Amino acid sequence: MEKLWGGRFQGKSEAWIDDFGASISFDQKMAKEDLAGSLAHVAMLSKCGIIPASEAAEITAGLKILQEKLALGELEFSTVNEDIHLNIEKLLHEEIGPVAGKLHTARSRNDQVATDMHLYLKQAVAEIIQSLKHLRVVLVQKAEANVETIMPGYTHLQHAQPISFAHHLLAYFGMFTRDLERLEESVKRIDISPLGSAALAGTTFPIDRAYSAELLGFSAIYENSLDGVSDRDFIIEFLSNSSILMMHLSRFCEELILWTSHEFQFVELTDAFSTGSSIMPQKKNPDMAELIRGKTGRVYGNLFGMLTVLKGLPLAYNKDLQEDKEGMFDTLETVQTSLDIFAGMIETMKINTEIMEESTQKDFSNATELADYLAKKGVPFREAHEIVGKLVLECTQNGIYLQDVALSHYQEINPLIDDDIYVVLSSKTAVQKRNSYGGTGFDQIKVALENAKKTL
């Protein structure tokens, strides 16, 4: 089949080489955007008097037929035509004849593909933003139901201080809020039209780039045509933001994987988000959480791949940029699905509140409470720290915990200790009293929840 750019060539191409150079297997995802861009472009050509209105009407009608066929799944693409742009132009030619050739006036595939990608990413990011907003709602609802659920707080994966489970959930709420802000703020750099930049230097035709941008719903146009077709920083920014978002999902998934284990038993995931073993009948595996954790590396890889593709490219377009799409498509799908799966896991998981709280009674996470107690009695904190550290060592040697130590022994250690120490050492008291702003105290959590709700 004759190629649309074949005038300069004499030799015939070979199918296996065509297959290597073709991108239609993946860039056909942008068929909708490519047709939308062409409709805006032909409208602009007509408005500016570059092509007659009658021909513009023919082209427009043909493009709308292709839109209908696309919606019905009736468009067939070929690797002979390389990419989505040439495939659609060929299909348009089959619909309306030679006038289809006028569509490409004052346009290059360089600005055409950049336009498609801006349109595609803009819509897809909007959908991710909605899913992220839903996840934040789920976290707030789960936190609101668990304000007084006590759990161990960890450092180094060792019991550190008791906290409210709601406090833990709201920590992730803060992280996902920043993820949301990053994505929302990045939209203004996606929402820019490169259409009309042509190959790299603009065009000799009297086009109206602002008009085509307006038709496509863009809020701005690239001020420099070379910039418009050369860079993919808007994709890199999305991949970077996605990597941070997936990192947050992965960290929480790691905790869910630990918490569902027999050693923790803090939470139980519903059957829908779990799988079994082909040999061990008792197994209930947190596969969805593990997959999100695993897919995080995949998203990182897409970011590094894109950075590597671009790092040595001179301006303007180079065929290397064909490699800018699959990583973007894959990341969009991965992030979208991961968010939806994760929200479902959090929304439906069972919290074993008694086991969570009991675990805070079988450790020394209340040691800080004893040190603070002594400090409030006038003992310098460093001295109090030393006293409590030695007592913890003594307790571990005797197989008991701080709440098991007799009052008489406490008073031997320091006569300032009174019988109110046992209230101080309770997990609930330890949590309740941490009422500094942003702390885990119940009153502070209620404030945090109200503040969070205002941002939903």
Curated annotation (Swiss-Prot):
Compartment(s) where it occurs, according to its Swiss-Prot or TrEMBL record: Cytoplasm
Gene behind the chain: argH
InterPro entries, sorted: Arg_succ_lyase_C (IPR029419), Argininosuccinate_lyase (IPR009049), Fumarase/histidase_N (IPR024083), Fumarate_lyase_CS (IPR020557), Fumarate_lyase_fam (IPR000362), Fumarate_lyase_N (IPR022761), L-Aspartase-like (IPR008948)
Transmembrane segments: none
Catalytic activity: 2-(N(omega)-L-arginino)succinate = fumarate + L-arginine
Known EC number: 4.3.2.1
Family: Belongs to the lyase 1 family. Argininosuccinate lyase subfamily.
Protein name, entry field: Argininosuccinate lyase
Keyword terms: Amino-acid biosynthesis, Arginine biosynthesis, Cytoplasm, Lyase
Pfam family, one: ASL_C2
GO annotation, biological process: arginine biosynthetic process via ornithine; L-arginine biosynthetic process
Pathway(s) per entry: Amino-acid biosynthesis; L-arginine biosynthesis; L-arginine from L-ornithine and carbamoyl phosphate: step 3/3
GO cellular component, one term: cytosol
Alphabetical list of SUPFAM superfamilies matching this protein: L-aspartase-like
Species the sequence originates in: Listeria monocytogenes serotype 4b (strain CLIP80459)
Entry annotated with the keyword Membrane: no
Entry superkingdom: Bacteria
Gene Ontology molecular function, alphabetical: argininosuccinate lyase activity
